[in-house]
Amino acid sequence: MDFLAQVKKAVELRLATEPSPPARSLPLVDFSKALGEFGIIAEYKRASPRGVVRLDMPPWAYFAMLQPYAAAFSVLTEPYWFLGDYRFITMAKPFKPVLMKDFVIDNRQIDMAYGYGADAVLIIYRLVGREKAMELAEYAQRLGLTPVVEVDNLQDAKEAATWGGKVMLGINARDLATLEVSLQKAFEIAKALRGDVDFIIESGISKPEEVEKACMLYARGVLVGTALMKNPALIKELRHAAESCVSRR
């Protein structure tokens, strides 16, 4: 069984026992506008399929520390591989707009994102396929959420770029079949899409020059997880690179 098949099976088991979502009490923010011309999306990620990233950083401390520099936060809610929790959304929300990241296969997960206060939700094209990804993206938009449709190849990216609405693409440098990371591949996809659709670049970003490269390709932002979890102070350098690039492009 490959990784994505394992993921779908695990999510199906979760959905069988998950409670109903809470009623939303937090304001809804336009995630795209929050990024400005180019923003750093700081991700709270305690673990990944490769293992533990960091467990000694409380979520509220992370959000407070990075709030002055991040345009938005990404929060992992998947509990098995990422040690995530829906409650992390509510913790992040007072500081910045929030993207919920999970293996979303059902509208009920989008309801949970909405109920806990997220402003955007990740939908992985390769996990659910074209038709289901479109359905989930449309449902998210009906709730007022920004669907960030994650792609890891040019064919899927070009298809999703035609969907219109509030859809934003998340170009993932990580191949979900092998879990290998290639920023160069992500940059090539971004170059091919330039001007067609709003997009961010995910995975593998850890250096100011990588932020600048993404910015010069007219990405709307970069999502940085592991590097900031291990060294939150790095965001100052990344933010400086972003501001410098925006002033020159």
From Swiss-Prot:
One of its GO terms (molecular function) is phosphoribosylanthranilate isomerase activity. Gene3D superfamilies: Aldolase class I. The keyword Glycoprotein does not apply. Keywords: Amino-acid biosynthesis, Aromatic amino acid biosynthesis, Decarboxylase, Lyase, Tryptophan biosynthesis. The keyword Transferase does not apply. Pathway: Amino-acid biosynthesis; L-tryptophan biosynthesis; L-tryptophan from chorismate: step 4/5. It catalyses: 1-(2-carboxyphenylamino)-1-deoxy-D-ribulose 5-phosphate + H(+) = (1S,2R)-1-C-(indol-3-yl)glycerol 3-phosphate + CO2 + H2O. Its EC number is 4.1.1.48. Signal peptide: none annotated. This is Indole-3-glycerol phosphate synthase. It comes from Pyrobaculum arsenaticum (strain DSM 13514 / JCM 11321 / PZ6).
